[in-house]
Amino acid sequence: MPVLAGINSKVLKNGDSEPSPPPAGIYRIYNMRFCPWAQRALIYASVKNVPSEVINIHLKEKPDWYFSKHYKGQVPALELDEGKKHVIESAHIPEYLDDLFPESRILPSDPYEKVQQKLLLERLAAVAPAFYAAAQAANNPEGRDEKYAALVKAFEDAEKLLTGDFFSGKAKPGFADYLIFPNYQRVFWLSHILPNSPFSSESFPGPNFPKLAKWYRTLDSIPEVAAASQPTEMGVGFFNDYLKGTPNYDYGL
Amino acid sequence: MPVLAGINSKVLKNGDSEPSPPPAGIYRIYNMRFCPWAQRALIYASVKNVPSEVINIHLKEKPDWYFSKHYKGQVPALELDEGKKHVIESAHIPEYLDDLFPESRILPSDPYEKVQQKLLLERLAAVAPAFYAAAQAANNPEGRDEKYAALVKAFEDAEKLLTGDFFSGKAKPGFADYLIFPNYQRVFWLSHILPNSPFSSESFPGPNFPKLAKWYRTLDSIPEVAAASQPTEMGVGFFNDYLKGTPNYDYGL
């Protein structure tokens, strides 16, 4: 059974015809190769070994038919049951996959531990808006210091929240680890580009964040996570264009 | 066993001492009587008959100790296990209560039906920011038409999404119904105050929304929902002050 088949296929865009529904038993993920939210679904499918295929979508020239998969036209969307069912939103798709495939469950079964993982993820997700603000500052020095400071603050908060090796609180990564990793990976890519980056691209995020640095290295080296990630040079290249306002969703293909 | 004991107690504020932990088996909800998000937890506890007590918090003069219950100091927060456990966030507390008390489960057990209820709630929640924008327009005519139009649009979208009697898709109300009701109740209160309100306070929301009107009447008349709600005159009175910038969290007590 394939897992994440077609992850590096070119995007479908307005004018392209709608692909036929996924075959029975195959879970299709609508994706954009550099989208951190869609990557959450990819990582989960990869770690859980879900039979899956990926279709990439042009986010500036969306096909009309895509709005029948996601009413807002965003990624990710999960399509199953030969096209008859859809699940959207980056935090809901993983939980749904856990409910559907409990034998490879990543979220805890205990209600209290489960809800704490979801709440921790939401708390850690403060890194995302801080990242986008800092990214905008790359080409615009105005307010750059404040934006960098806000991003550093998000990292400091995460460093404090990381009390063991993983945000799961266990000996192996869990829901919060896998789902927040893509956001950190975006900052890692950005650290190659940002003028006076507050983070080290060599020993990311740098010596002030020893726990996060070890965590990032560990997550990054998990084969199932790597299989759901773009290589660093692709990510850096994409963001170079993105910051100029000309993202190339097929960068490197 | 009491349910929602103390729902009309006066707020605790900065300087007030921390209450002793809830007794074993009692679920404490930190609340503000007019907060639609906290009311989600109250309705769920009421419908599920969870042994519970309510402590109201002054949202402009928060007690320092409250930040140990909710790191942002917001309501709702659920406190249990004699003060040793906390669950926050208005959509997570209800799901947690369903996991904890599965015999009175409101969310569907089927994974697909469950995630669709959660996604539908998020879609319906577009009414909330539109409500706050329209409320600000009460005392400021600038941009009022656009703000009213956005709120009407949220109602039109909901009217379309309500394909049966309830957002649950079943013969009785479910997760999405109970959790979105407080937001509609706020618009109902506001319709008594708004100059040129686009909604009728007599047959709320009005003749253009026949399905929502029936839905609202039905939800409003459920005793367990009423027990978790403030009476109309209280809500209207609170919002009158709120719109002047001087909310009285103990209004009517």
Swiss-Prot record, chains A, B:
Positions of the GST N-terminal domain: 25-105
PROSITE patterns: GST_CTER, GST_NTER
GO molecular function, one term: glutathione dehydrogenase (ascorbate) activity
Source domain of life: Eukaryota
Entry keyword set: Oxidoreductase, Transferase
Listed GO biological process terms: glutathione metabolic process
InterPro entries for this protein: Glutathione-S-Trfase_C-like, Glutathione-S-Trfase_C_sf, Glutathione_S-Trfase, Glutathione_S-Trfase_N, GST_omega, GST_Omega/HSP26, Thioredoxin-like_sf
Amino-acid positions noted as binding glutathione in the UniProt annotation, renumbered to this chain: K62, V75, E89, S90
Catalytic-site annotation from UniProt: C35 (nucleophile)
UniProt keyword annotation of Transferase present: yes
Role description: Exhibits glutathione-dependent thiol transferase activity. Has dehydroascorbate reductase activity and may contribute to the recycling of ascorbic acid. Participates in the biotransformation of inorganic arsenic and reduces monomethylarsonic acid (MMA).
Protein name per the record: Probable glutathione transferase omega-2
UniProt organism field: Caenorhabditis briggsae
Recorded name of the encoding gene: gsto-2
